Amino acid sequence: MTKLPFGETLTDWGYAGGWLMVRAMPGVLARNVFDAGAWYAARDGGPEQLRKNLARVIGTTPAEVPDSLIRASVASYARYWREAFRLPTMNQAELARRLGRVFIGAEKFAIAREGGRGAVMALPHSGNWDMAGVWLAQNYGTFTTVAERLEPESLYDRFIAYRESLGFEVLPLTGGERPPMDVLAERLRANRFVCLMADRDLTRSGVPVDFFGELTRLPAGPAKLAIETGAPLHPAHVYYDGDDCVVQIDDALDTSSGDVGVITQALADRFAVNIAAHPQDWHMLQPQWLADLSEERRARLEGTGDR
């Protein structure tokens, strides 16, 4: 067996240790530990890229983003990880019942199932999307999603096992036995549900959209699947309200144009409304807009740079 580079081994061990340690902690202690970590991460203005991203959301400059919003955002991100580490040990049925009490638009799943074509749920990285998945798995059985491969491979395998333990079917974005789009379309035709993270695709295959007044790219997958299979495409959103994790399923987008660009822009517009309503829960710490990429990367993206 090929040995992992030492740094990658430490990364995997770190996550494995975190999972074991946080699961074993009393709930109050885990909350205090992650709150302290969030406070530390938000000191001195917090992560620079997070500040740039939130500036677009609230319509200001990075320097004018309130420190209180940065602190709330980092705390929300820390909460996601605290819950993620502890989620497999929670009572899944009870968790689904708690989520169901504050779920907005849950009836759309039943309507979609009656329609016979399943449904595509497209989400941004907001709140705790894994908890939303637990509710769906508990109420409607296994659904299908896609995950990018991580390095090291052992860490990727750990994340896959984690989500499969919650009732998710997880397809690799690359390197699988079949193209993921083929499998997703097959699941929809079998009247099953597909859930996709869809707020960032800074590659040549991404669809150009206007997002908070600036150019970026979003994945084409949700729109393509809806066009190909006739499944409804629902924007979804997850956010925190006090101790509650709220899942919101919006009305299906109009996909009758058959135009991937038009549909993806409509998805971006709905994401923008929902993110603006709960900016602190949008966990986007990477460059989101083309303007934040290096000139070299933008040139490669447009196909004008060296390959």
In which residue ranges do the predicted regions lie?
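A conditional alpha-helix N-cap/helix-loop micro-motif detector
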Residues: 101-102, 126, 152, 174-178, ...
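Membrane-anchoring hydrophobic helices of lipid-metabolizing enzymes
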Residues: 1-123, 156, 160, 167
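Conserved beta-strand termini and adjacent loop/short-helix elements that scaffold enzyme active sites
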Residues: 104, 146-148, 173, 250-252, ...
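Non-catalytic C-terminal accessory region of glycerolipid acyltransferases
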Residues: 2-6, 67, 71, 113, ...
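Short, flexible loop segments at the rims of nucleotide/cofactor-binding pockets, characterized by
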Residues: 95-101, 169-175, 212-213, 260
